[in-house]
């Protein structure tokens, strides 16, 4: 049996330099190789003409550059593109490209499904299978960057920002998310500014501390409720890491970070008559008073079977005004890609659920239906 080849997309620059040293080559070859892969989208070692033939032969024998394939894509009326990415064994994750006037953001997945069970999120209802590898995470960026590059006649902009806000909880896959983000930031990788790479978390506090020690990127935190009682229902990880503990972890991260410019983004999905009252706005403002932040109010994007509805514009407006009375910076997120189920909370993919969460839900729904009938 032939030895399995090393997928170079699994290695950041430190890993590539170690590989070249082990091969008896100069470490700077890693810089050359990364430039070919990430700046030019090249996968054929023979095309890398500033690398000598002997080394190219060594690389061909031992290594490969393999990104997960794009299975299909849909384009929204607003220009948003949702990609289905094949990660093997009949499973897909979803990646979303969001073009704007001054930037183009790619929303990247970190897990096949999600290990958390946020009750307002479509991904969470699909259950969980596994963590994505480094090559499967950075491969989403690589594939879409090449797709956009080959589709220049359509006018899509190159990727300027990456947000780890797709399927999964990034901080439950730090071992692979950190090297992938290293490649995004590396001058020989995608060369993105640390302020243009954002990781989002629902509150896995010990992992947030580890991230702060390893990397400096922008942070977005999923709060979604102004108190523990409601957050225990909406974001069940809160039962393990309640708000006070989460906010303390956020402040520790801010203290270490330059990328956040002294504050984080608070994500708050607006659920009709669940978390959107003026009293809850006052409660949220008081909760966040000691944590430097800007608050991103996200109109809920319904999905089939969702138990929640979207807050009305008037309720969102009232909620926003209360927060601003406390001197908080508030942004109401513009919904993008909802006509192709690419908006926040709508990503589902194709998952073999190891948790059996979706099957249990279907069983419960069928039992309810039988009872009603």
Curated annotation (Swiss-Prot):
Protein purpose: Specifically methylates position 2 of adenine 2503 in 23S rRNA and position 2 of adenine 37 in tRNAs. m2A2503 modification seems to play a crucial role in the proofreading step occurring at the peptidyl transferase center and thus would serve to optimize ribosomal fidelity.
Similarity comment: family membership: Belongs to the radical SAM superfamily. RlmN family.
EC number annotated for this UniProt entry: 2.1.1.192
PROSITE patterns, A to Z: RADICAL_SAM
GO biological process: rRNA base methylation; tRNA methylation
CC cofactor: [4Fe-4S] cluster
Binding sites annotated in the UniProt record for S-adenosyl-L-methionine: 168-169, 200, 222-224, 301
An MF annotation (GO) of this entry: rRNA binding
Record field: catalytic activity: adenosine(2503) in 23S rRNA + 2 reduced [2Fe-2S]-[ferredoxin] + 2 S-adenosyl-L-methionine = 2-methyladenosine(2503) in 23S rRNA + 5'-deoxyadenosine + L-methionine + 2 oxidized [2Fe-2S]-[ferredoxin] + S-adenosyl-L-homocysteine; adenosine(37) in tRNA + 2 reduced [2Fe-2S]-[ferredoxin] + 2 S-adenosyl-L-methionine = 2-methyladenosine(37) in tRNA + 5'-deoxyadenosine + L-methionine + 2 oxidized [2Fe-2S]-[ferredoxin] + S-adenosyl-L-homocysteine
List of residues binding [4Fe-4S] cluster: 114, 118, 121
Protein name: Dual-specificity RNA methyltransferase RlmN
Encoding gene per record: rlmN
Disulphide-bridged cysteine pairs: 107-344
Main location, first listed in the record: cytoplasm
């Amino acid at each position: 049996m032939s030895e399995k080849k090393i997928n170079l997309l699994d290695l950041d620059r430190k890993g590539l330099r170690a590989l070249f040293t082990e091969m008896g080559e100069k470490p700077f070859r890693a810089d050359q190789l990364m430039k070919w892969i990430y700046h030019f989208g090249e996968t054929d070692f023979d095309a890398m003409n500033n690398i000598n033939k002997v080394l190219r032969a060594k690389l061909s024998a031992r290594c490969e550059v393999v990104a997960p394939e794009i299975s299909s894509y849909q384009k929204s009326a607003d220009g948003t593109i949702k990609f289905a990415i094949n990660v093997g064994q009949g499973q897909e994750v979803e990646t979303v490209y969001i073009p704007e006037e001054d930037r183009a953001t790619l929303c990247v997945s970190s897990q096949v499904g999600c290990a958390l069970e946020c009750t307002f999120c479509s991904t969470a209802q699909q259950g969980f299978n596994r963590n994505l590898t480094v090559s499967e995470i950075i491969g989403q960026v690589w594939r879409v960057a090449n797709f956009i590059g080959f589709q220049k006649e359509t006018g899509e902009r190159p990727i300027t920002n990456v947000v780890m806000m797709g399927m999964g909880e990034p901080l439950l896959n730090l071992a692979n998310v950190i090297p992938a983000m290293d490649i995004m930031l590396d001058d020989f990788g995608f060369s993105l500014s640390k302020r243009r790479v954002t990781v989002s978390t629902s509150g896995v506090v010990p992992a947030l501390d580890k991230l702060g020690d390893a990397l400096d990127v922008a942070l977005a935190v999923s709060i979604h409720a102004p108190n523990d009682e409601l957050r225990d229902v909406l974001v069940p990880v809160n039962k393990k890491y309640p708000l006070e503990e989460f906010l303390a972890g956020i402040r520790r991260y801010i203290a270490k970070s330059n990328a956040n410019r002294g504050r984080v983004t608070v994500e708050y999905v607006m659920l009709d008559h669940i978390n959107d009252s003026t009293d809850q706005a006052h409660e949220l403002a008081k909760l966040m008073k000691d944590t430097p932040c800007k608050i991103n109010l996200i109109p809920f994007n319904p999905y089939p079977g969702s138990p929640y509805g979207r807050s009305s514009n008037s309720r969102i407006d009232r909620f926003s005004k209360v927060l601003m009375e406390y001197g908080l910076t508030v942004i109401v997120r513009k919904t993008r890609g909802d006509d192709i189920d690419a908006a926040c909370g709508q990503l589902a993919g194709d998952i073999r659920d190891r948790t059996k969460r979706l099957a249990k839900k279907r069983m419960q729904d069928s039992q309810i239906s039988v009872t009603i009938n």
